[in-house]
Regions:
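Structured, non-membrane catalytic/scaffold regions adjacent to prosthetic-group chemistry
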Residues: 1-27
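C-terminus-biased signal that marks the final domain/tail of proteins
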Residues: 5-10, 30-232, 236-260
């Protein structure tokens, strides 16, 4: 995405190995998730397949909802949108779900205010830390003095860290992440998890609306040859908001294997 404050224009550069297109719109906003929108690409079979099978269109529709909730955007409301973890209609789809605006995986995000020549860069973790503001005019004006270490951000426009970082939800998400990695390691190394029953109970409580919580519990039981329990958790995973159709297909295939 590129923008010009002096021209009041924003556009998307869409690119594949064989062609490049510039997408613009006459609307007051230009939205983008992870699929092409230009005439050159929108009817491409790969793009159509991506829209049908990925989380991109779902996120786009959620973005439209959030813009309706925030009709007059400023840098703070944009940060709020980028940090949103809900699904469509505000549904709780679990923490870290790919269908959310904030999937709790991003290294950073950037907010630009071209007309005022300002930009904000998020700090760790996952767009939840402070957004630090920089002013292009002051940076370039003071450039000759940058021969010593000094802070060059505009602290007056810092966006505070998300209060989610102080919540029980954040603590549970950290538990969920570490527990999921422990399950993966147990499956890969074929080593048991100590106090497995208590461990699984804690894992399920840590992120109960996220489909992967149940999928990975099922995978752990499948690795232990406990197909009956694995099937129960695969079915539970299917009741949640799953990232894309390929994951749904995979889980349904695993359920069939459990019944062999």
């Amino acid at each position: 995405m590129i923008g010009s404050g002096s021209e009041h224009q924003t556009a998307l550069i869409e690119k594949s190995p064989s062609k490049t297109a510039l997408y613009k719109t006459d609307k007051h906003e230009l939205l983008c998730t992870n699929h092409y929108q230009s005439d050159s690409f929108k009817n491409d079979k790969n793009n159509i397949a991506n829209i049908a099978t990925s989380a991109s269109e779902y996120r786009y529709e959620r973005l439209v909802e959030l813009l309706k909730e925030n009709p007059k955007l400023d840098y703070k409301s944009v940060a709020k949108i980028l940090r949103d973890q809900k699904g469509k209609n505000g549904k709780n789809i679990g923490m870290g779900n790919e269908k959310a605006m904030n999937q709790l995986i991003a290294h950073h995000s950037i907010i630009f205010q071209p007309e005022k020549r300002r930009f904000w860069i998020s700090t760790q973790p996952y767009q939840l830390g402070e957004y630090v503001c920089y002013d292009f005019d002051s940076i370039f004006a003071e450039a000759p003095s940058y021969n010593v270490d000094k802070e060059i951000n505009d602290a007056a426009y810092t966006i505070p860290a998300d209060s989610f970082l102080l919540s029980d939800g954040w603590k549970r998400f950290l538990t969920y992440k570490s527990s999921k990695e422990q399950i993966k390691a147990s499956i890969k190394k074929k080593t048991p998890i100590e106090n497995e029953s208590a461990f699984i109970g804690q894992f399920l409580r840590s992120n109960p609306e996220e489909w992967e919580t149940y999928y990975w519990t099922g995978e752990l039981y499948r690795a232990e040859q406990n197909k009956e329990k694995a099937e129960v958790f695969y079915h539970q995973a299917l009741t949640k908001e799953i990232n894309d159709s390929s994951e749904v297909y995979k889980i349904k295939k695993l359920i069939k294997e459990c019944n062999k």
